[in-house]
Amino acid sequence: MHWGLFSFLFVLWFAGPVAAQTSITLEASPVAIVDATINGRPVRLEVDPRMPDMLALSTPAAERLGVRRLPFAQVQVGIEGGGSMRGRIARPNIRFGERSARNMAGIFPVPVSTRADGVIGPGSLPYDIVTIAIGAEAAAARDIVLPLENPDAWFVQADVGGRSLRVLFDVANDASILNRPAVRAFDRDGVIPSAGELSERPVILGLSTLMQPVTTSLTVHGIELGPTFARTVSPLLGALEEDAIIAEGAASETPPTLTLGGQALLSAGCSSVSVNRRTRQLTLRCAS
């Protein structure tokens, strides 16, 4: 599995989550949170649309919740532009109310989340339709309906500045992010001039890195990108262990990717982003 933002390479492979049956709506204020139990203990999990269908826990959180690592099972996480980190695999008993989900869990020596006990991908939630409410609905609204390659992975392909980009959604952070392959392409086009000094910005799982602010008139389906940053070769920051991050030795092979930030969605009057697994479609409901 190779995503624009980060990728997961599993040493062992297990069955996916149980089939979803119904729908759930989560409020992104400021982040989407879902209540659950892990091994019978109540938890709050941050739902991140950029995550694949798995659960991520920090090492301290896993110890606190009594989540046992599987012997000889490891996971390697590659974060585009910043290297990779190794973690351990677990199969905790996760329940969402009356619904059970035997999700894959990765345990990593990084903060993961400051707002919740862990971070989970929306594709792990046992529901047919998962909706993340972003803001109030506009008086005149339109639905931007986009096909999904994988209904458990919330990314789409879209035209951005005449180029086909993989597009992800980050409702928890304001800024939109261009990964390094996208930066190289748009820099050649002259459409992302620098707009200031390098700034430390969050990436994912509690990690951050230095990024370059840029100005741009690029849009995706008529949505302006808002505050936008370009990934650089700066290392990842914030790991809990000194040797947790493995430096990237070769050029990234990830496709050009745009992560659309929360401010772009709010400025476009988007009230929600949702996925229907059965139709394999992602819908953005925004002002018309």
Model-derived segments and spans:
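Tryptophan-rich substrate-binding surfaces of secreted polymer-degrading and adhesive proteins
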Residues: 1
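Pepsin/retropepsin-fold aspartyl endopeptidases
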Residues: 19-288
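Bacterial N-terminal signal peptides
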Residues: 4-15
